[in-house]
Amino acid sequence: MVNTNLVSIKINNIPLQVPEGTRILDACRDNGFHVPYLCYLKDINEIGACRVCVVEVKGIHHLVTSCNNQVQEGMEILTNSPRVREARKINVELLLSQHHTNCPTCVRSSNCELKQVASDLNLTVDRYKNEYPEMIWTSTFPLIRDAGKCIKCMRCVQICDKLQTLNIWDVSGTGSHTTVDVSHNLEIKESDCSLCGQCVTHCPTAALQERDDVEAINGIHGELANDDKVTVAVVAPAVRAAWGEEFGLSPEFATDRRLVSTLKSVGFDYVFDVDFAADLTIMEESNELLARLQQPDKYSWPMFTSCCPGWVSFAKSQYPELLPQLSTAKSPQQMFGAVIKTYFAQKKGIAPENITCVSIMPCMSKKRELTLPGMDSAGTGQDIDYVLTTREICRLIKADHIDVSRLPECDFDDPLGEATGAGVIFGASGGVLEAALRTAYHTVTGENPEIGEQSPLKVLRQIGSFKELEIDIKGVKLHCAALSSLGEARRLIQAMKRGECHYDFVEVMACPGGCINGGGQPIRPSFQNKPKDCADRDQCLRGYDARSAIRFSHENKAVQTLYDDYLEAPLSDRAHHLLHVEEY
């Protein structure tokens, strides 16, 4: 409920009225008064650790941290007094004295919050000796931590605890040796980390980042430089909603088709749309759901989606008893890799081992997924050879000095380039469930359901990132849910275990908002106060769906051809071998 009680305050001698209970920081920024900060995350991390947000309050002798103190009636606040500016400078200088300032070679050099605050404060001289900690960290794990860049803001600790409920990070050491490390003295690879990457996208510096695989693709000995290799790039749905942000381009200009042209300029031989494999996933998953519904007593309910590896990892470590309830369908990434290394290789007369398949994903967990058992369908190694996050592919493009703004649009390649609107909404929370039910409805009734206000899929209630839905298919009502963030997943599972609710079909995405806000997406400071606010990226994908000539996965002609020529039918023996897992 919105607080309608107002208090009268002054900020920099300007009288204002703001809602009672408002934090000083919010009151200042909402009214156009800039107050810097490094640790603050609204409703998640409000601990005043960085001391950069200090302000002066008349009548209080000491400076006040604005992120965790509320306005009071009659309060007079100064945001930029000489005393405030000097305190901020000293605090940031002390942070820099324990920070590895290799800014020119840092992956966050263009969007480092610490660097920006230091620049805004006009810090041009190092007044304190620079000594930063160094800690051993495995270079092969998909998540990399550089202790020398950690400013102890505690964002990673809080986002993992409160949003994802995995408690991977904790404070270790005491006094000047205090730092952040993996909980329980574990190595990161031994922990329950789901690799959702939310700690990375909320880190103000490069203390946390994905393992960089760009050099393996674009280096002097990289895959693109090897003339004996046929290089294939496959692009996830959510990438098109965000890649242009790294180049200052609008979603209307930075389209999926312009990304195809860009990747061809980089040197990829083929560029395919993962939306195609999303349509393939829908064909398998919707038929699997219907098959289970025909034998309801044979299975435990609900059936969960399985295309998010962060969610699958969470289920394996936290609720292994639920694994039989996960769909056996592989993710679109892994389905595509299997199809490329078998069907596509045969069709083009290319030995599978001579194909390098690079998956471009909004996700860090995909870097681990490609190494899991059963992801080598062709018998010649991994189906997917490399995963590059959206951030990595943008760094690769920049390294090649490609002017994206001058490139034309270009279609995805055949025979695996056709996709539908149902495939593209995979990248947004609720999209997998909606796409699957569109096709399940057609399979049962022989008719396509209406889309939009007249859709048989009705939203019963929505609370934050949790949505409860119901669909009537020929008199059979399916009770469904779609949710994002692992904390929401835990709350739903616990509620089901207590017998408070029942569902037939549940979609879970590890990242708030779905893949559009994945751990591999471009980092935007505006997100760091609103971790669930990714409406613009969601609307981008919904727009692609609305404009699509085909909006049902079962109408994808390229998918139909794949079944006719190779897979035979959904859930066939060959489809099971290539497109499903035996166990988790």
Enumerate the language-model features and the residues they cover.
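Mobile "lid/hinge" segments at catalytic clefts and subdomain interfaces of large enzymes
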Residues: 167, 200, 393-397
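Iron-sulfur-associated redox domains of electron-transfer enzymes in respiratory
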Residues: 8, 20-74, 80, 84, ...
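Fe-S ferredoxin-like electron-transfer domains
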Residues: 51-195, 201, 208-225, 230
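Residues that cap or flank secondary-structure elements
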Residues: 16, 138, 148, 191, ...
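Residue-level recognition of alpha-helix initiation/capping sites
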Residues: 19, 141, 151, 194, ...
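Generic start-of-chain signal for non-secretory N-termini
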Residues: 1-23
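Short strand-loop junctions, especially beta-strand C-caps/beta-turns
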Residues: 12-14, 183-185, 238
